[in-house]
């Protein structure tokens, strides 16, 4: 049976992170993460096995470059074909749901965890957490930070170094600190590439004007 603090954590209420059940769950995650990060580069089968044990759900064709960090792992649900570059940090004190075909750049932080603004509550050791959802087809650039309670809509692009503190709609490019929508994703983003017959041709006029950073 889950403890009161575990239930409070997953429900967006204040909780004590030093609850014995939470401490034990974090230790379990750290052991699995340690083994994952220390695995030999060629031992992909071991990493897949460890990831399936660590995460609440892991779809087909996922690959997360080590090293990675998370708090619990069990609150993370990955769709199919998720790719994360080096140094992903996920503070999954609340649910983190990542859809299919999501790309995550290096040094990205996904943080469900927060602390009260009131210093008295902080001194009591109270924390809170809010769920994060990253929908299908999203690309998150390197060094971006996703704050508690955020939803990023389908196929959107988050520019490198952005700090996402509010929901981002589907099919947009959003950049900055705080992150703001700068334009929609359109057919021109496909047309910028002169792919030729085999889909591997050179750039027609360069992607820089259309890049999120």
Question: Where are the regions a protein language model picked out?
Answer:
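Terminal amphipathic alpha-helical/low-complexity segments used for targeting or macromolecular assembly
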Residues: 1-61, 179-213
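Short secondary-structure boundary/capping segments
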Residues: 6-7, 54, 124, 131, ...
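Short, glycine/charge-rich beta-strand/loop segments that flank catalytic centers
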Residues: 48-49, 67-69
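Short-chain dehydrogenase/reductase
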Residues: 63, 139, 157, 173-175
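Flexible, glycine/small-residue-enriched loop-and-beta-strand segment within the central core
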Residues: 68-151, 177-195
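Beta-rich strand-turn-strand
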Residues: 141-167
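A contiguous, mid-protein "functional segment" used to position or interact
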Residues: 163, 169-181
């Amino acid at each position: 049976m889950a403890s009161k603090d575990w239930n409070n954590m997953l429900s967006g209420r204040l909780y004590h992170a030093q609850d014995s059940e939470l401490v034990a769950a974090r230790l379990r995650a750290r052991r699995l993460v340690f083994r994952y990060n220390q695995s030999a580069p060629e031992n992909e089968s071991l990493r897949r096995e460890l990831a399936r044990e660590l995460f609440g759900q892991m779809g087909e064709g996922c690959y997360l470059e080590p090293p990675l960090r998370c708090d619990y792992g069990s609150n993370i649900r990955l769709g199919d074909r998720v790719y994360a570059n080096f140094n992903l940090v996920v503070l999954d004190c609340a649910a983190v749901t990542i859809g299919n075909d999501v790309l995550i750049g290096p040094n990205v932080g996904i943080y469900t965890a927060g602390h009260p603004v009131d210093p008295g509550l902080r001194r009591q050791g109270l924390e809170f957490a809010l769920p994060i959802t990253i929908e299908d087809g999203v690309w998150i650039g390197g060094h971006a930070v996703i704050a508690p309670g955020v939803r990023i809509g389908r196929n959107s692009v988050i520019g490198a170094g952005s700090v996402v503190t509010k929901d981002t709609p589907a099919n947009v490019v959003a950049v900055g600190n705080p992150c703001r929508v700068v334009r929609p994703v359109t057919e021109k983003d496909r047309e910028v590439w002169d792919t030729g017959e085999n889909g591997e041709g050179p750039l027609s006029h360069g992607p820089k004007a259309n890049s999120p950073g």
